[in-house]
């Protein structure tokens, strides 16, 4: 994983989460979570996605956000009764097989090294019920001509850096999700805030841990 000290970065990250808001709303729009579903948000950070989810007309009955950084979780807003935040790692989720109807992993996969990314995707497949939906958000190329012109130079820096710039590495995880048994059903790009790629996939995997 990119060598970002999330404990040190927690306050700064909370202040810039407005740059992620458009993509978080878009992936929730594509996912359409409902009141009779259980949702897991992996790498929830300061629970920005859960805050957006709580404002939806029909939020899920149960939502769990996990993050490796207690400092990030400490910046979460008050969430609805029955929702939960836990310290946990995306590569070893502390949940039984087929525990959730919906899962999200936003601004995570592009930060992970290949082996960790495969583990995280496999864990998401494991804890999702067959037919469950996964929404991912990763950094993607900008739409505008000026942004596209500068993007190769930005990517060259991001791929060499293991600190903050690494968070701008772009990634289309579609093929890796497909290899893990997911079937892509929709994708969308957002341009305001961080240029982002939103994917929604259906879980076709029946493989449990071990």
Task: Outline where the language-model segments fall.
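Conserved class I S-adenosyl-L-methionine
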Residues: 1-34, 48-52
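A short glycine-rich, Lys/Arg-flanked "PGG" loop and its adjoining helix->strand segment in the class I
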Residues: 118-130
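Class I SAM-dependent methyltransferase SAM/SAH-binding core
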Residues: 40-92
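Short glycine-centered segments of the SAM/dcSAM-binding site in methyltransferase folds
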Residues: 38, 131-133
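C-terminal alpha-helical "lid/dimerization" subdomain adjacent to the S-adenosyl-L-methionine
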Residues: 137-180, 185-188
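A short acidic, Gly/Pro-enriched loop at the edge of an enzyme's catalytic core
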Residues: 91-103
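A short SAM/SAH-binding and catalytic strip from SAM-dependent methyltransferases
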Residues: 102-115
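Core SAM-dependent methyltransferase catalytic element
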Residues: 180-182, 186-210
